[in-house]
């Protein structure tokens, strides 16, 4: 229950940040956006329709069509995110900051949007619209969520050329790129993963200490030295970046002659890391 309350809080805060990106930075500078929000802005520039109301109607329609591609939790979280975002778009409409620097506003629009959407996606929700398409692409095509979202968003952005012009469209693309990078940071965090390969005569002692002291699993692989022709068992360990110094200390204490390779890892799914179903 506590985790769900924290998740809902993250959804609401994320929706607020995204609404600020639109009302504080995008609309005052005639910038576009991707997905449903981009369509909402086009309709606002053309007909002065309320972004909050339009956003809610369009996303509700897409949810009715695409909810079957989302699991139960994601659907509920998406409904909360869409409702909160539409509400905040309405409440913050007309807010402004005293800045006429288009480049600065573009950067901050990307940062706020990236933080907002990143928080929503991190807890398992979406902002509906193109985010639903990105989730589907991630689930069935194994596309990176952030870049799938960027792809679908760009389709709407290029369409906005006829409304906001070439210069503002290019600034919008910059905003989306910044948002994608910030979103990646929010979703992945600073917990860069490392995969460690260890070849040692004291492999059993190292593996036992990693299990006991670090509470990490160790996989034993079979290998063979080309020069010696001897068969060897190789340890393969996946850890968080901040655990690397402790692992090095364990290896040094067990075998100062151990051969160790440290690999950078982009994503790790499974027990002890990220649930692969998310």
Swiss-Prot record:
Q: Where in the cell is it found?
A: Cell membrane
Per the record, the major location class is: membrane
Topology class, membrane? Multi-pass membrane protein
Keywords assigned by UniProt, alphabetized: Cell membrane, Membrane, Transmembrane, Transmembrane helix
Entries under Gene3D superfamilies matching the protein? 3.30.70.120
A GO cellular component entry from the record = plasma membrane
Give TM regions.
8-28, 46-66, 77-97, 101-121, 145-165
Which domain of life does the protein's organism represent? Bacteria
Pfam families reported in the protein's UniProt record: DUF2179, YitT_membrane
Q: Does the keyword Calcium apply?
A: no
Which PANTHER family does UniProt cross-reference here?
UPF0750 MEMBRANE PROTEIN YITT-RELATED, UPF0750 MEMBRANE PROTEIN YXKD
Record's family? Belongs to the UPF0750 family.
Task: Provide the protein name.
Answer: UPF0750 membrane protein YxkD
Organism source for this protein?
Bacillus subtilis (strain 168)
């Amino acid at each position: 229950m506590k985790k769900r309350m924290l998740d809902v809080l993250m959804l609401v805060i994320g929706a607020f940040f995204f609404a600020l990106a639109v009302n504080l930075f995008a609309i005052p500078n005639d910038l576009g956006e991707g997905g449903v929000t981009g369509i909402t802005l086009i309709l606002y520039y053309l007909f002065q329709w309320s972004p909050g109301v339009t956003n809610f109607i369009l996303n509700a329609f897409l949810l009715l069509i695409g909810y079957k591609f989302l699991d139960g939790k994601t659907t509920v979280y998406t409904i909360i995110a869409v409702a909160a975002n539409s509400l905040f778009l309405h409440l913050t409409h007309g807010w402004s900051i005293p800045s006429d620097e288009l480049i600065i506003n573009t950067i901050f629009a990307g940062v706020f949007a990236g933080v907002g959407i990143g928080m929503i996606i991190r807890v398992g929700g979406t902002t509906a619209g193109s985010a639903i398409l990105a989730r589907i692409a991630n689930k069935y095509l194994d596309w990176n969520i952030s870049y799938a979202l960027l792809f679908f968003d760009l389709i709407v952005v290029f369409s906005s050329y006829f409304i906001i012009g070439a210069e503002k469209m290019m600034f919008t693309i910059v905003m989306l790129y910044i948002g994608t990078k910030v979103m990646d940071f929010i979703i992945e965090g600073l917990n860069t993963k490392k995969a460690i390969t260890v070849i040692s005569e004291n492999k059993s002692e190292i593996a036992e200490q990693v299990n006991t002291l670090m509470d990490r699993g160790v996989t034993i692989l079979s290998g063979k030295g080309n020069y010696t022709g001897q068969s060897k068992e190789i340890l393969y360990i996946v850890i968080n970046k901040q655990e690397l110094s402790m692992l090095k200390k364990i290896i040094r204490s067990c075998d100062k002659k151990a051969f160790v390779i440290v690999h950078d890892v982009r994503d790790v799914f499974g027990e002890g890391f990220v649930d692969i179903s998310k």
